[in-house]
Every structure is written in C-alpha cells, then in structure tokens.
Regions:
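A solvent-exposed, acidic/Ser-Thr-rich amphipathic alpha-helical stretch
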Residues: 37-47
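Hydrophobic pocket/interface hotspot
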Residues: 16-21, 27, 47-49, 66, ...
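Short aromatic-glycine motifs in intrinsically disordered, low-complexity regions
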Residues: 49-55
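Hydrophobic-ligand-binding modules of eukaryotic lipid transfer/binding families
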Residues: 1-9, 15, 49, 98, ...
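Hydrophobic ligand-binding cavity/cleft-lining segments
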Residues: 1-38
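Hydrophobic-ligand binding "helix-grip"
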Residues: 38, 55-103, 109-112
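A conserved amphipathic terminal alpha-helix motif
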Residues: 103-105, 109-144
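Residues at helix-coil transition
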Residues: 22, 71, 142-143
Length: 144
C-alpha cells in the first residue's frame, strides 16, 4: 500500500469544516478538483464522484463507498477499479482541533497490482490536486 498525505491549518472550528466537507452536493461550489459528488454522507453510502481534468473538463467518474464516518472527526471512502486486487483508492479526511482552529489531514491510500505501474503518475499528480482542494476548502471555511 502506498500513501500520499497532505495537511493544512484552517482558522475555523472542526464542526464548520465538517459541515462543508459532508455537504457533498455543494462540493462543486468550492472544490476545483472534485466537481461533483452525489449521495448521502453516511456510513455505507455509495457516492457518485466526478473529478476534473487539467483542461477543466470531467476526467474521471467513480463510485466510492463510505467506509468510515465519525462526525465531526473523519471520514473515509473506498473506490476500486474493476476489482479490488487490481487497484483500490481510499480517501481519508481527518479533522483535529488545534486551539480555535483545525488541522486538516488529507490522505490517499493506493493498493493493488496496478499501483507499481501507476505510482510515478500518482506520486507526482496527486499531491498538487490535494493541495488545491485543501486550499479551496480553507478559503471557503475561513471566508464565511
């Protein structure tokens, strides 16, 4: 299993950030990477997710399942390509209260037989996407 991890400090309480990140239907209003998410923000729910490509057009659609949901601390979803043993991606967002603000820890885990073949792309391409998403979330949470 390979992991990519990013962190950001946000000057807003975890509860406020939680309300933004679990309002999946409004991700498109602030998220430059994940342009559409539909589904219920609850344990076991299957979501429909569309990610944006470099050209700003829809690049990838997938259907992750929420495998962990601990309000207002963390959630995790899992998506697989064809079969789990080929390629699985887990996204985890954790919120830690730090003073009057929050540390957001954003992780992506990759496993399966395809990961060694894709790692060069994942290791270079995913961190900037996570940073862009984190920065946009910070701006939204600190603005309102």
């Amino acid at each position: 299993m390979r992991e990519i991890k990013t962190e950001i400090q946000i000057a807003a309480p975890p509860e406020k950030i939680w309300s933004i990140i679990t309002d999946f239907n409004n991700w498109k209003s602030w998220n430059p990477i994940v342009t559409q998410v539909s589904g219920s923000s609850s344990l076991g729910s299957e979501l429909s997710v569309t990610m944006c490509g470099k050209d700003g057009k829809a690049a990838q659609k997938y259907k992750p399942k929420i495998t962990n949901f601990e309000a207002p601390k963390s959630f995790r979803w899992r998506a697989k390509m064809m079969a789990e043993f080929l390629f699985t991606n887990d996204k985890t967002i954790e919120l830690e209260k730090v003073g009057s603000g929050t540390r957001l820890i954003h992780k992506e885990f990759f496993s399966g037989m395809m990961v060694p073949l894709m790692w060069g792309f994942l290791d270079k391409g995913v961190p900037p996407m996570l940073k862009s998403m984190n920065d946009a979330l910070k701006a939204k949470a600190e603005k309102s």
